[in-house]
Amino acid sequence: AAKYCKLPVRYGPCKKKIPSFYYKWKAKQCLPFDYSGCGGNANRFKTIEECRRTCVG
């Protein structure tokens, strides 16, 4: 798995609500969240499939 899969979810400081997914390391699964459109980190994916491919293996 990529190193950034261990990063905590970061919504960012902006006001948008962009449906996204992040990998929750302790739960070993990809979960949905609303990205704000700016800021955040690399633990953010457009689809659950992309999240699983990158972080689950």
UniProtKB/Swiss-Prot annotation:
- Ranges where the BPTI/Kunitz inhibitor domain occurs: 5-55
Task: Please give the annotated consequence of changing residue 10 to A.
Answer: Important decrease in binding affinity for Kv
Name the Gene Ontology molecular function terms of this record: potassium channel regulator activity; serine-type endopeptidase inhibitor activity; toxin activity
Query: Superkingdom of the source?
Result: Eukaryota
PROSITE patterns in UniProt: BPTI_KUNITZ_1, BPTI_KUNITZ_2
Any one of the GO CC terms: extracellular space
> What does the UniProt entry list as the effect of changing residue 49 to A?
No change in binding affinity for Kv
| Stated consequence of mutating residue 26 to A | Important decrease in binding affinity for Kv
The answer on whether this UniProt entry bears the keyword NADP reads no
PANTHER family per UniProt: BPTI_KUNITZ INHIBITOR DOMAIN-CONTAINING PROTEIN, KUNITZ-TYPE PROTEASE INHIBITOR-RELATED
What the record says about family reads: Belongs to the venom Kunitz-type family.
The name this protein carries in UniProt is Kunitz-type serine protease inhibitor homolog delta-dendrotoxin
